């Protein structure tokens, strides 16, 4: 490893995950550079921001992982809001899941974590719901965050204040590999210049487009996700 790459992080992808990782490394005194083609096209600007570990009906290890992750969010958001000065819109407002019969309700993987709603109380939570939905579960521990208008902008500002370097319009052509170790990336920048960026660690955060960098990854875009 080159001496000048110590504690340097190259993040490929400037969406919600890329910015979140950049923020954590930067606030712990790493040198961080974020590459993105067009950050405004990231999923974080269109995703609903649901924190729905229980309402999504997760099971087994994934449920435990989701619960642990969800428990960390308030403190994490508190740090981002403090550094950025932007309210991220975190709300523990609860999420309602309706059911047409009790059998379906009791088969729902996380039903034991929810508060039962009869039809009368379900209508109070979801005004105008079709009468065929007779039962519901209110997961009071779930909630939402304002990704599009607040969290993404807050992360951008917090990262900038921690001296994260952003390279917009960057197209990663390939990773630089030597002796089975990733040393950096070959990048075509917005001005058409090809450059090599060396670093201690490369973190791939391209979401659905990760296969463009590593074509053996079993990742593909899904409508609505």
Where are these regions (language model features)?
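Glycine-rich FAD pyrophosphate-binding loop
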Residues: 26-46
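N-terminal Rossmann-like FAD-binding beta1-loop-alpha1 element of flavoenzymes
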Residues: 7-33
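Dinucleotide-binding Rossmann-like beta1-alpha1 core, especially the glycine-rich loop
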Residues: 49-128, 134
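Short loop/edge segments at beta-strand edges and connector loops
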Residues: 36, 118-119, 152, 168-170, ...
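Central helical "cap/lid" subdomain
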Residues: 189-225
């Amino acid at each position: 490893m080159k001496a000048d790459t110590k504690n340097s992080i190259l993040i490929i992808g400037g969406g919600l995950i890329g910015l979140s990782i950049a923020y954590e490394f930067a606030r712990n005194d790493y040198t961080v550079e974020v590459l993105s083609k067009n950050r405004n096209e990231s999923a974080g600007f269109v995703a609903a921001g649901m924190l729905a570990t229980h309402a999504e009906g997760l099971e087994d290890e994934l449920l435990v992982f989701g619960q642990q992750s969800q428990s960390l969010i308030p403190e994490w958001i508190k740090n981002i809001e403090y550094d950025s000065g932007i309210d991220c819109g975190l709300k523990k407002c609860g999420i309602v899941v309706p059911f047409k019969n009790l059998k379906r309700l009791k088969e729902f993987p996380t039903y034991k974590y929810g508060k039962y709603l009869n039809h009368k109380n379900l209508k109070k939570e979801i005004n105008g719901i079709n009468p065929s939905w007779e039962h519901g579960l209110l997961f009071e521990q779930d909630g939402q965050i304002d990704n599009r208008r607040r969290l993404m902008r807050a992360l951008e500002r917090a990262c900038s204040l921690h001296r994260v370097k952003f390279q917009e319009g960057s197209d990663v052509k390939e990773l630089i590999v030597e002796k089975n170790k990733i040393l950096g990336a070959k990048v075509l920048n917005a001005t058409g210049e090809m450059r090599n960026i060396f670093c201690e660690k490369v973190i791939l955060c391209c979401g659905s487009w990760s296969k463009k960098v590593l074509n053996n990854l079993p990742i593909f875009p899904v409508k609505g996700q």
